[in-house]
Amino acid sequence: MPSTLDGITVLDLSTGPSAALTTMFLSDHGARVIRVLAPDAPLHRAGGFIIWDRGKECVRLDFDDKAKFQGLIAGADILVEDFAPSSSHQKLVERDALAKINPRLINCSITAYGKRGPLKDEPPLDDLVLARMGVLGGLPGFRPAPVHLVHPLPSV
């Protein structure tokens, strides 16, 4: 039986849980997901990646190999990344450059605070994101102060 996303190819450049989970769900719905890792990156950086990488193909790519990266971009329908605006990899995913290679590419960027604005370079630490959302002050606990949320809710 065909799946919703049969025939769709997704490039996964995730470095954290938000983008990894996003591409996991796309894979669950039938997309071909290609997880792109640097040659020296560990396959699973944290325990969750063992699950979040299910159903994905994995390729190791030196991002200096522009021809290979552009080949992946040319064959993709969707690119999912979570690079911080200050990341050295940010230049790889500039929309204008990608559009020249593949004008139909959908570029999905998942960041804690967006690519522009005063908080764009803030680290995406769960407690900071929760505090800015106003969630920590509303959590129940046995003390009058905010309670640390163990589950990384903002990351997902």
Feature names for model-found ranges:
Residues 1-3:
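Basic/polar N-terminal segments that are highly enriched at the extreme N-terminus
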Residues 11, 52-100:
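A structured beta-alpha segment of the ubiquitous adenosine-cofactor-binding alpha/beta core
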Residues 25, 29, 89-156:
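Active-site-adjacent "lid/gating" segments in soluble enzymes
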Residues 15, 63, 84-85, 111-112, ...:
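Short glycine-/small-residue-rich Rossmann-like dinucleotide-binding loops
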Residues 21-63, 72-75:
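PLP-dependent aminotransferase-like
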Residues 18:
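Active-site loop-to-helix junction immediately N-terminal to the catalytic Tyr of the SDR YXXXK motif
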Residues 5-7:
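Phosphate-coordination loops involved in phosphoryl transfer and adenosine-cofactor binding
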Residues 9-11, 34:
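Conserved beta-strand elements of the Class I
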